[in-house]
């Protein structure tokens, strides 16, 4: 596929998009408002253009790798926030985002070469004939695509039209221990998606996945929970250390790589006393020192106890629809009983320790002296800052860059 000089394509690898933090990261990376409020990425691309002929096209691809399918029917389309947007500059002029023209809100007809509003496809990926002799693989994927048209104006005469195409591809690989070795094979530059053709009821070759060399940013929010460790009998060190480190090892096949990783608040006492914090400290150190190929940029987020809800929301209706106030009063004891049962069931599913940490984090957030237990921070802020670091303009420094963001800094950034 050939691109014009006004086309820019960015790829992001996201691991842990089913986690509490990862869900928010995925939402943010696919939110147009993240890019129009934080314009360093867009500004950098405009600065590289000496002239603009036609539209400027931004292709944003996010690849999620999960053990099971999530959010396959969810819409990521957002309403553009014209109030809180930031202006951009180009060749001495300052351009402001204007309301979208009516004709641009029309749905684009589906075609193989066009990104569409909320277009959805699914299929499978299998090893190519060129890989004969290697272990075979075959797994399913799903993909959503949607677009926005942004109109930036400088006075009445000058204008820049920017088309933002978002694509999120979810690769469902049940055995997470195989992810590191599969990474360079899947992202070889020749691997094609086999999408399902609804009209002919069969699978046909689709787009090729990019080469791992062309993916410059990886975001990792992998981690263990007590309930998962108990259920799977897999040591917590696998998700907290070995899997993130091995993925980073395969990811750093070139020198221009950025990794954004979420760990945990830490200090010398914690890392020497508790295994969880010791493992997190080892991961941070080894990502910085032990990778065969150094990362150009390593961003470490160290959140404290996070205010947020793991698992699914608990919804119990208080009485039937159109019930009277008196009927609701009589129903209230039954409502409490049902809610209690669902709450206990959900707490057991995600782990009592995890549920307890949620309660503690919410109760100590910004309370005096609470930093002694680790500075609590809303999970939404952790997700936002991780997304922000992933889209920041690449550093121009020659040497490796390490940035550590504390829980307090996360709270203050947003």
From Swiss-Prot:
Coiled coil segments of this chain: none
InterPro entries for this protein: Him1/Fmp52
Keywords for the protein's UniProt record, in alphabetical order: DNA damage, DNA repair
Keyword DNA repair set for record: yes
One annotated GO biological process: DNA repair
Domain of life: Eukaryota
Keyword DNA damage: yes
Function: May participate in the control of processing of mutational intermediates appearing during error-prone bypass of DNA damage.
Name under which the protein is recorded: Protein HIM1
Lineage: Eukaryota, Fungi, Dikarya, Ascomycota, Saccharomycotina
